[in-house]
Amino acid sequence: MKKTALSAWHEGAGAKMIDFGGFLMPVQYSGIIAEHKAVREAAGLFDVSHMGNFYVRGERALEFLQYVTTNDLGKIVDGQAQYTLMLYPDGGIVDDLIIYRVSADTFFLIVNASNCEKDFAWLSDHVGGFEGVTLENRTSELSLIALQGPKAFEVLGRVFPEAGLDKLASFHFATVPFGGAEAMVARTGYTGEAGVEICLPNEEAEALWTALMAAGKNDGIQPIGLGARDTLRLEMGYSLYGHEIDQTVNPLEARLKWVVKMDKPNFIGKQACQQVELDPRKSVVGFSLDGRAIPRQHFKVYNSDKQEIGEVCSGTVSPTLQEPIGTASLLRDYAKTGTPIFVEIRGTFQPGTVRRLPFVHADRP
């Protein structure tokens, strides 16, 4: 099993470690609810170094990425990032990812840990038609640290006092020196709160981590495991590969039409999306349950006549709302906010209601 450059720190801090995407990762430290609360109210630090990262370079790099992704990369400039998807020809999702434009011929991609090898192979399979474009997998060399929460920029400013990082716009990034290397600091995240994700060489990761923890000590900063990362993203309704999205799901049936630019020239999966656009049958929605039972992935969802209308994608008890919440893929006729539903849990039908996403309106400036 692979380890990140911060594994020894996590173990020293008493984290409960699990296998996630082939990496030994912290699932929790003090506890999911306390960690979740720290991010919503103060600041939290996440090791997300298991995520895959690639460089795409060459004069035709933009043309290549436009072909293999759904969003319009032509709309962003140097120092800007974009959320996007890679699709199979049938419209199923290869992965969701963020692309960072370093320059006109250099792009940096961050992909899901569980899809890293698959994604690199997919890109490699399609790059041949774009002469001069090179792919470079840097996953094993780089660490990724996320600092999230309403006090994130106060903490960041103590470690990088001259960088003016609080002025970064959403989905923009800057490169700043740290130790003997450069760190890429991007105003992105997976929590809904203000914050950044910082990419830097493994050799400098622990020094940055400990500096941020020390800088946030009086603000209540906490290290955050994958457990709270999941409850935070679910409160925001953000997709997780293998749950809301996968190779069987078309983005137009998963609340992701906004990243599929049909007016862009041909891209892989475009024709399939055009077909679904004519008659989308399903939609991913948020819901809450009336009782205390917790909905889990693949649990069946029914209408008031007890007819099956879909299944749960993700579920948890919201630490903020203190009630069971989830996402579900439902037939579109039942996707309207306020629609009554029933989730089958251990042989019982638990009543609930379709809810508007996000569940929580985080204080993101």
From Swiss-Prot:
One Gene Ontology cellular component: glycine cleavage complex
NCBIfam families: gcvT, PRK00389.1
EC number(s) reported in the record: 2.1.2.10
Job of this protein: The glycine cleavage system catalyzes the degradation of glycine.
Species, as recorded: Chlorobaculum parvum (strain DSM 263 / NCIMB 8327)
Assembly with partners or alone: The glycine cleavage system is composed of four proteins: P, T, L and H.
Gene Ontology MF terms in the entry: aminomethyltransferase activity; transaminase activity
Reaction equations catalysed: N(6)-[(R)-S(8)-aminomethyldihydrolipoyl]-L-lysyl-[protein] + (6S)-5,6,7,8-tetrahydrofolate = N(6)-[(R)-dihydrolipoyl]-L-lysyl-[protein] + (6R)-5,10-methylene-5,6,7,8-tetrahydrofolate + NH4(+)
Record GO biological process: glycine decarboxylation via glycine cleavage system
Keyword Transferase carried by entry: yes
Protein name: Aminomethyltransferase
Record-stated family: Belongs to the GcvT family.
Species classification: Bacteria, Pseudomonadati, Chlorobiota, Chlorobiia, Chlorobiales
UniProt KW keywords: Aminotransferase, Transferase
